[in-house]
Amino acid sequence: HYEKYSLKSLLGVISPGCEIVQVDGVTEGAACTTLLAKDLIDNDDPLLFANSDQFLDWDSNEFMYSMMADGIDAGMLTFEATHPKWSFAEIDESGYVTRVAEKDPISNIATAGIYFWRRGSDYVKYAEEMIEKNIRFNNEFYVCPVFNQAIEDGKKVKIFQFDGMWGIGTPEDLNYFLKNHE
């Protein structure tokens, strides 16, 4: 895809100076794939991950403003759903995430695949801990369960609820989106 779609020049127009990390083959999951960029993200800069199999109708500025609030270490964009194809978050009475689950509806708060970390180094630390503990789902290391490591360490994780989530990762989801989205 890198050469076929001229990704270097395309991404350079969208985000001048961006770094591109190419993947040679299949990894053991998205968390492993993200860590291929460890030398670029293991720092004190904010980090934002976005899955690529959804269409979102949202205000990214509102999300980032909410995530940058004092005392917040990490967060996620969420929507209401219960289908077990999503990741899910459970929150306490203060609105902080108490745990997340992959493909297990522990609540009706599903994650939209947009994940924020105030410091990239926190993500790297907790992703490596999760991998070291061999915490897998469907034999893969997913990104969302990394939050559980942070929560166990006392980090404050919050949600940002919205209504504009459209999954497009399967042919059925894409067809539904094309027929129903205006």
Predicted features along the sequence, with ranges:
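Catalytic-core segments of class I nucleotidyltransferases/pyrophosphorylases
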Residues: 96-166, 172-175, 179-182
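Active-site glycine-centered loops adjacent to acidic/histidine catalytic or metal-binding residues
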Residues: 53, 80, 170
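Conserved core of the sugar-phosphate nucleotidyltransferase
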Residues: 5-9, 57-134
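Conserved N-terminal catalytic core of the sugar/cofactor nucleotidyltransferase
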Residues: 1-46
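Short beta-strand-to-loop acidic/aromatic patch adjacent to the donor-nucleotide binding site
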Residues: 44-55
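Alpha-helical elements of Rossmann-like donor-binding domains used by nucleotide-donor carbohydrate transfer enzymes
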Residues: 35-36, 62-63, 146, 176
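Conserved beta-strand termini and adjacent loop/short-helix elements that scaffold enzyme active sites
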Residues: 21-23, 77, 160-162
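Short, high-confidence coil segments that cap the C-terminus of an alpha-helix
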Residues: 44, 71-72, 155
